[in-house]
Amino acid sequence: MYIEKIKSPTELKQLNIEALKVVADETRQAVLNRVSKHGGHVGPNLGFVEATVALHYVFDTPKDKLVFDVSHQSYPHKVLTGRASGFLGNVDEMNAISGYSSPTECPEYDNFEVGHTSTSVSLATGLQKARDIKGTKENIIAVIGDGSLSGGEAFEGLDEASELGTGIIIVVNDNEMSIAEPHGGIYKNLRDLRESNGQCNHNWFKAWGFEYKYLEEGNDVEKLIEVFRSVKDTNKPTVVHIHTEKGHGFSPAVENKEAWHYGMPFNKEDGSRPERPTTESYEQLLSDWLLKEMKQDKTLVAVTAGTPSAAGFTPEKRKEAGAQHVDVGIAEEQAVAMISGMAKGGLRPVWTVFSTFIQRTYDQIAQDLCINANPAVINVTWGGTASMNDITHICLFDIPMLCSIPGLIYLAPTTCEEYFSMLRWAILQDKKPIAIRIPSNGVHHTTENVDTEYAYEAKYKVTQKGEKVAIIAAGSFYQKGENVVRLLAEKGIKATLINPRYLNEVDRETLDSLKGSHKLVVTLEDGSKDGGFGERIAAYYGTSEIKVLVGGIKKDLYDRFDLQQLLSDNRLLDEQIVEDVIDILS
């Protein structure tokens, strides 16, 4: 097997075309081996195998610089740069390899940590400018595809690459897909270019000042080598547009490209997946609820940004929603400004977004939404410790971010019933933008009545009255708060338990009511505590006699963390919290 022996891409240059085709086949099988056992991005990587072999054959990496957008296509690159053991080896060897570009893992060949979309061209222009100033001669190659061209930063990067006017190669990996179907006018032009074999008159890339090459056979190693050779050492901004097949070589991924964009472990022989217990999910509950409400309210519009799965909108549900579902492509900034405009125009927009991606929208939320006080709704999902754990995808920063923006209410429901009650109120009210942090610790139900109306000022809910100690447990950490209260009761301490519901500001009345009867307040939040919910409460009590123990995650860039270890390191295991409470009281 070639790939077991290849330690660097330079070894590919000794092989003939037939051997390179074997390398491509072996690489595809290695990728399949990893994702079938470990999970990961399936379709995007399988479709870019031949292109990766050709890129490393033609160009002289690591002198020549490769930048992969979003890293969804970087697995074959890892196989060919000395990391095949992470695809062929045991579980520990697989765990050692990130699912994304990682200079920590391989500084020689991975130039950047990349996991969010539309950044490759911008990053590459920085390398381009550095090369030009230093007077060196290396090729700079950015790889972009899988819907990333719908993101605003991709446009900004292309604009700058054209402005610089020196050699840069942008490989547009056109597999006709994003995560789901692509959205945006650029994809109409890509379709026209495909259908005309790159010859149509209205060429978006040429209009921006790029040299342009088109290759229909984007999964043909020999033809890829030919087109890459033709642009090597160019001194002009150049686009190489290759038409590939997402999931190439694995029929289940070809037949259902959206479902196989990313996959958990599966049987690589037939694509079957292990049966898992059927459990409720907020994605399914939300999409069903929205579709039902849409039938009664034609002004209700569900918005997604390239990830319709965040709101549970399968292809069938997107079809059912029709014009009442809008996917803006991988363009979160556009989503925020658009929902503000929708609300201004009399619609009731609900945008659902993964916590890790809302980080891209700070300015739009502050400027376009909150200053204008337009009553749009933002669902923030997968926020917290129990979500994604790669360094580029950690979901710990939405609370400090959103709570720093004036004019935005950020709600944290603790149960399914409370969530949908908050959602209904947020949709029907017409005064302010409302964000809601969907619980990330599973779907919990309550038989108790939940409020149907919510104030625009924070109003906490005391769910159990006690003394000496008050536990204020927000959102998906509320059940942790219940556990802590129970454990304290076993030690003779009857604690007060509070569901704060509001993350963006403190409820002064409730906090003042604790003075005199309580010595300690413990705050629990499922995210970064620096600048978060608990620190606001600590600041409020600053001049009082009440002590505050702020429970949350220390600010850091965590990578592939173990959940229980992360909680333990931050003194957030139930027993640790109880120990700390007793120590402080004593």
Specify the residue positions occupied by each region the protein language model found.
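Cofactor-/ligand-binding subdomain signature composed of acidic, glycine-rich
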Residues: 1-34, 252-268
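Glycine/charged-rich beta-loop-alpha catalytic/anionic-binding loops adjacent to active sites
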Residues: 29-36, 96-113, 135-141, 314-328, ...
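Cofactor-binding active-site loop characterized by glycine-rich and histidine/acidic residues
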Residues: 41-164, 300, 305, 314-315
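Non-catalytic terminal/interface segments that mediate subunit docking, oligomerization
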Residues: 64, 250-359, 364-374, 473-475
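Acidic, glycine-rich active-site loops and adjacent beta-strand->loop/helix elements
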Residues: 70-75, 144-151, 172-178, 218-219, ...
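A glycine-rich helix N-cap at a beta->alpha junction
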Residues: 87-97, 163-177, 370-382
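Glycine-rich ThDP/TPP pyrophosphate-binding loop and its adjacent helix/strand module
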Residues: 110-267, 272-279, 283-288, 408-518
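Peripheral docking tails and interdomain loops at the edges
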Residues: 265, 273-278, 387-389, 409, ...
